A protein has these predicted regions:
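Catalytic adenosine-cofactor/nucleotide-binding cores of aminoacyl-tRNA synthetases and other
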Residues: 1-187
């Protein structure tokens, strides 16, 4: 309805802008969609230096609902990052979201501190523990499938729309043999 109203009524053929549709979708789903991490192929495993593990990282399910927490258990000092994030930021200071500030090197990330104010200018990267077993397949808007790993809490979101942080919104359709099946819904 909002899309039709935004175009106005006239006798000319209407051209629908996908950007307008995505913007309207975001307004509708953003207030309720919980946030999670997913790391898509290809990804790389990196070792974390100077970080005490095991560690439980607590993140908000939604930035406006501070009482709803999700946890990521980091049992060993290894995480996976998407290969393009790793390559684009190698040699730079980065923020691994919820985990801390690091200098990203060749095959490793060295913990420097947890100063969030300092990290404002850093690239903020999503990550998952290297021992993550939950897989995800997302049917993309162009019909292709994205394969990757997903945060464990996504198992509780079947039939809901979620935001995969730094990626897109998708609807978690089902869970089959330790693999979540999802459909892309909006940027």
């Amino acid at each position: 309805k909002q899309l039709v109203l935004s175009m106005g009524i006239n006798t000319n053929d209407a051209i629908i802008s996908m950007e307008n549709l995505y913007a309207i979708n975001r307004k509708l789903i953003d207030p309720t969609a919980n946030r999670y991490f997913a790391v898509f192929e290809p990804y790389v495993k990196i070792t974390l230096k100077n970080l005490a593990v095991p560690k439980v990282v607590q993140l908000y399910k939604h930035p406006n609902r501070k009482n709803e927490i999700r946890e990521i258990k980091l049992n060993k000092a290894e995480v996976v990052l998407e290969k393009n994030d790793y390559e684009a930021n190698s040699g730079k200071e980065i923020r691994l979201m919820g985990l801390g500030n690091f200098v990203l090197g060749k095959g490793f990330a060295e913990f420097t501190d947890n100063d969030l104010a300092k990290a404002k200018g850093f690239p903020h990267l999503h990550w998952l523990p290297s021992d993550t077993e939950l897989k995800i397949t997302v049917l993309n808007e162009d019909g292709s499938e994205l394969q990757g790993l997903a945060e464990t809490g996504l198992k509780d979101e079947v039939s809901k729309v979620v935001q995969l942080e730094r990626k897109f919104f998708c609807k978690i359709e089902s869970m089959e043999n330790s693999t979540l099946k999802a459909i892309y819904t909006s940027k």
